[in-house]
Amino acid sequence: TKKWHSMCDVRSHWDLMLRSCKQTIFERLEDLQMNVEWSQLFTERKIRENLNENMFRQQKILSIHEIVGTKNAIERNLELNNLDIEYLIKNALKRINDFWKTDFVQALINRFHKQWMVFERKEYGSANGIDLYCSPDIAVKIQNHWHLVRIDMQGKKDSCFEELEAMAMVSWIMGKNMFPRLPDRYVIRIMAWRNGFWNQQRINSSEQKLTQSNYLIESDVGQMQIVLSKLGKDKSMSLIPLARKSSTCRKCALRESCPGGSNLISGNIQQTILELAEYTQE
């Protein structure tokens, strides 16, 4: 549910900076579409506004955690008491300014590509009966192909599934009326911030990759349905599948109410006992 999701959505200050940074890039791109360019001063003002807004929204969520007694643990896990606004602003501006200098954005500024648009992932698309929130950040028509761009604010190490996950953007956009229905008419471009620079990865779409991507999506949905079935009607977390590594739990907002939050090994043992108890009662 939305309420459950908002309770989980507690982030470190660094993650809030990244979220605000991407939000600012979107707003600047939308203005660019209307031939409005930002000054450096205005860009800094917008990133401050967005960061303050996201931090204020998080404080409201933390006030709920304070009522249920989990706020102190969350603040300790995410180091929320250590705040340096100017350091965050400096890093955000570095990312935005360097993004604006990339060949890709410069081509948009100089009107080399006439047809392009910005999307937000709040809009869902449908693929094989599954609602997907995986739109590209930007779609640009270059000659006979649509280039689907994903902006990764803090690029992680390459995953063996990264290409197939990116192909979900093709599934999403093929469900829209104004776009071609042939997978080979798309090119995926991932612009990821890695080691202090914007790196670009290009992936050519194909029917085979799209089929594999859809299979991966269906598999992920199946796993999520298993998680929901474990919650039961009372939405109890007592039998919810736990993480494999304790490092995964470190920044989880629900750590204090999770059966494996304080000790993953102990949590797994307790769940095994509960599952055996349920099995013997059937």
Where are these regions (language model features)?
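Metal-dependent nuclease catalytic cores that hydrolyze phosphodiester bonds in DNA/RNA
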Residues: 1-133
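Glycine- and acidic
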Residues: 3-7, 150-155, 236-238
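A residue-level signal for conserved active-site and pocket-lining positions in enzyme catalytic cores
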Residues: 21, 138, 252
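Hydrophobic transmembrane signal anchors and adjacent membrane-proximal interface regions, especially
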Residues: 34-36, 51, 61-67, 76, ...
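Mg2+/Mn2+-dependent nuclease catalytic core
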Residues: 113-210
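Metal-dependent nuclease catalytic regions and adjoining charged, substrate-binding loops involved
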Residues: 168, 172-281
